[in-house]
Amino acid sequence: MTAAALASLYGLNIDQIEYAAEIAMEHNLGLTCDPVKGLVQIPCIERNAVAAMRAISSVNLSRFLFSTRKISFDEVVATMYRTGKDMDEKYRETSHGGLAQIYYAN
């Protein structure tokens, strides 16, 4: 949504705004939520900082590539939902998988 807000602030048209949101969201599909020691510092807060930079890049891409787009924002949202449903429960903010598991193993 940050990408869409930035695109709007930059005066892009509605198609470019939607495309900015689509680009930003599609590059976050399938991310695990595996907080180390049950805290949100790693990886969540760091991930938000990276996502903010990605939002800026998404706006720039949407400005120049919107006429070539193939996937809609709605398709990305539906895919994110399906991906989340398919994801193993241990990667859903439980600290039982991913980075959290590696940290406790060391």
Regions found by a protein language model. Give the residues of each.
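Functionally critical mobile loop/hinge segments
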Residues: 4-106
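Glycine-rich phosphate/ribose-binding loops and adjacent secondary-structure elements
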Residues: 1
